[in-house]
Amino acid sequence: MERLTIVKVGGEIIRIPEVRDSFLKDFSIIAGYKILVHGGGSMLTELARNLDIETQMIDGRRVTTEKILKLAVMVYAGLINKEIVVGLQALGVDALGFTGADSNIICSEKRPIRDSIDYGLVGDIQEINVQLLNEFLNKGHTPIFAPITHNGGGQLLNTNADSIAGELAKVLVYDYNVRLVYCFDKKGVLYDEGDENSFISVLSYTDFQRYKENGIIGGGMLPKLDSAFNALSAGVKEVIITCASNIKHTGSGTHLKL
């Protein structure tokens, strides 16, 4: 099977133009088919703060009110997505920007209230149009996904970018040899977020559960690792969490294993 690299890049990388441009240059030279999923939470939080709109996070996941959703669509599907697309086009990559609503490529349902926790207008992925995605890839396009989906009934939904990357990897594993890479501003998963030297080179699912229970791993890393291990369980060949500047180096970062 052909190789497909799915990269998720965090908002802390793309919010700084120089760092973003360096990352896009490295992404552009990845051989074979590739897909990029981007976040942008830090930019959304900053905009909400400037507009005096309250934001709330629960276990690393954003609570999405109607006001926050409007900002998310503007920031994610608008500014960030198009800056990435034009950056890659300038590097010779035929980038094509998407939300899940475009061509009905990712359909979600609103997350139900569980244990009295209501995440608001957050979407959990139900279906991905794999046939259409394959058509875009085979025509030489590089899909760039913003973390916005829809429910098929006219409602846009905020969907975790880590989850989108993981779900894309899971459904495409039947057609490609999939490599899934999560990029952010650290070397990889850390024992201590404040200590770069506490880098974990290999993380098993058993260790992940233990670290989660002990509070060693938490916050935004939880949905990232949940999605990553789900993808690994579904047959994705390689899952790595690494620093964006190391995307070219396959041996770097935290490698996950079941």
UniProtKB/Swiss-Prot annotation:
Any one GO CC term of the record: cytoplasm
MF-aspect GO terms: acetylglutamate kinase activity; ATP binding
Keywords of this entry: Amino-acid biosynthesis, Arginine biosynthesis, ATP-binding, Cytoplasm, Kinase, Nucleotide-binding, Transferase
CDD domains noted in UniProt: AAK_NAGK-like (cd04238)
Residues spanning the membrane: none
Family annotation (Pfam families): AA_kinase
Top EC category: transferase
Originating species: Azobacteroides pseudotrichonymphae genomovar. CFP2
Name of the protein: Acetylglutamate kinase
Any one GO biological process: L-arginine biosynthetic process
Taxonomy of the source species: Bacteria, Pseudomonadati, Bacteroidota, Bacteroidia, Bacteroidales
